[in-house]
């Protein structure tokens, strides 16, 4: 069936393309990676290096690497039924093809967040609608996954930030003891932070831990 002969499919494809950036940010590992990289850059004290486009590009590449098995599993299960006049997002296609993606969301979401959104649905949604929502619905899993990823990103960011904060405080105290109060501690501490980060294999450790943090 060609696209001009199936306007519903064309509308569906255009709609998915329009929300694709939102799906990538909120429904994949991209959010956690981007937040951690931004915190790491701020902790090092280099506000504009690497630029945002480089950080987001690295986060996107790593997201493709992390999501690769899930995407391949979805592709293998994607066997849409061609029904005349029916859109391609049928419930049968959804239940079969998106099972690996649901498993990814469940494994990387905190159970308390999922339960929070389930209880929120019970308290706020109309009775006739909430009865149709399954416990593993994407309407529950995606928000729970997003909040869980933000929480984990802030935890990792805190662990990254503390050592560099200690270096800043140490340099600041040394400068005060030497009477060099007019010298910016950030200017002196930046080379030391970069040196320690490189000697410790900071990029390898950070990327390895981030990738391994996903089930």
Swiss-Prot record:
It is a multi-pass membrane protein. Keywords: Cell membrane, Membrane, Transmembrane, Transmembrane helix, Virulence. Pfam families: FliP. It comes from Salmonella typhimurium (strain LT2 / SGSC1412 / ATCC 700720). PROSITE patterns: FLIP_1 (PS01060), FLIP_2 (PS01061). GO terms for biological process: bacterial-type flagellum assembly; bacterial-type flagellum-dependent swarming motility; protein secretion. The chain crosses the membrane at residues 10-30, 53-73, 156-176, 188-208. This is Virulence protein YscR. Disulfide bonds: none annotated. The keyword ATP-binding does not apply.
